[in-house]
Swiss-Prot record:
Gene3D superfamilies: 4'-phosphopantetheinyl transferase domain. NCBIfam families: acpS, pantethn_trn. The gene is acpS. Coiled coil: none annotated. It is found in: Cytoplasm. Belongs to the P-Pant transferase superfamily. AcpS family. Its EC number is 2.7.8.7. It comes from Campylobacter jejuni subsp. jejuni serotype O:6 (strain 81116 / NCTC 11828). Mg(2+) binds at residues 6, 51. GO terms for cellular component: cytoplasm. Transfers the 4'-phosphopantetheine moiety from coenzyme A to a Ser of acyl-carrier-protein. It holds the Pfam family ACPS. The keyword Lipid metabolism applies. This is Holo-[acyl-carrier-protein] synthase. It is an enzyme of class 2 (transferase).
């Protein structure tokens, strides 16, 4: 089992999004993921989730794992769900993933566990 965690100030993501708009979103979110954005807190949560997912691999966001190798969606109970690309799943021998995202007091945090 490996674990990754990321925390970010919601205001930081909000500022970047205000400055760069859709160009910023297109750099790290697929069109399907962009539909999940309801407010700055959910946007920051998506950022934290992708960062945490890359850290769980032990590599961070880099040439081995891009933002688009990580897909965030919702399950039938509206809980966040994580899926890695086939390349990542195979190269890192991943059989299970778990993602938790929370927002409080101006911060978004995400924790990812992979087996």
């Amino acid at each position: 089992m490996r674990v990754g965690c990321d925390i970010i100030a919601i205001s930081r993501i909000e500022k970047i999004h205000s400055r760069h708009g859709k160009n910023f979103l297109d750099k790290f979110l697929s069109p399907k993921e962009q539909i999940l954005i309801k407010n700055p807190a959910t946007l920051a949560g998506l950022w934290a989730a992708k960062e945490a997912a890359s850290k769980a691999l032990g590599v961070g966001i880099c040439e081995l794992c891009s933002f688009f190798d990580i897909e965030i969606s919702k399950d039938e109970k509206n809980a966040p769900k994580l899926k890695y690309s086939q390349k990542i799943t195979k190269n890192f021998n991943i059989t299970q993933t778990s993602l938790s995202i929370s927002h409080d007091n101006g911060f978004a945090i995400a924790i990812v566990a992979i087996v």
